[in-house]
Amino acid sequence: MSTIDVGLQVTESDLFKATGDFLSVLFPDAEITQTQQNQTSMPKGGFISMTPLFLTDLSTSAVNYEHDGISDYGRAELRRVDEWQCQLDFYGDQAQNNATIFSRIARSEFACTWFMENANVLVPLYSGPPRQTSMINGEKQWESRWTLEFHANPLIVVSVPQQFMT
């Protein structure tokens, strides 16, 4: 059985990079991390962690065909509206303030413009409300943590070979 050349234009790594870059612009002093990484310890001080929650399809796929008019094969690009949810955990002395700032900015024209100009792989929709989710660390000390969910439309395109009649 032969393999099929399937392409994916926006990956999970792209979504994390875009979200992390945006967080770095808003909070330059905070370290930005991705959770679910093996053999990594929690950073010291204030930081923000990102955890993927859902990638939900909200529509059926729309198909765009690309063909050069000469060869027998081209590409079919499959696009649909998806919603990506990413949990953001804000830690440290400024956790509540930073979570509040992000929750307001996520639904703003500023956020939409920033992503379009700097990381055009997702469109921010909104943020859920920040909530306190304090935790006890490895030293049995309370850590300030505020959590929210960031909702966005990723601009994912899957492409597959398409035969054409020439």
Give the positions of each predicted feature.
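Oligomerization/assembly interface segments of phage tail-like spikes and tubes
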Residues: L78-D93, F102, E143-P154
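Short amphipathic alpha-helices in soluble, non-transmembrane regions
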Residues: T100-R107, M165
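Acidic-leaning, charged glycine-interspersed low-complexity segments
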Residues: R107-V158
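Acidic/histidine-enriched, glycine/proline-rich intrinsically disordered or flexible terminal extensions
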Residues: V158-T166
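Small/polar-rich, solvent-exposed N-terminal microdomains that initiate assembly or binding
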Residues: M1-D72
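Short, well-structured hydrophobic secondary-structure segments
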Residues: K44, T51, L58-S59, E83-N98
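Residues in well-ordered beta-strands of folded domains
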Residues: S49-T51, D89, L125, H151
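Short beta-strand/turn micro-motifs at beta-sheet edges
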Residues: S71-E77, N137
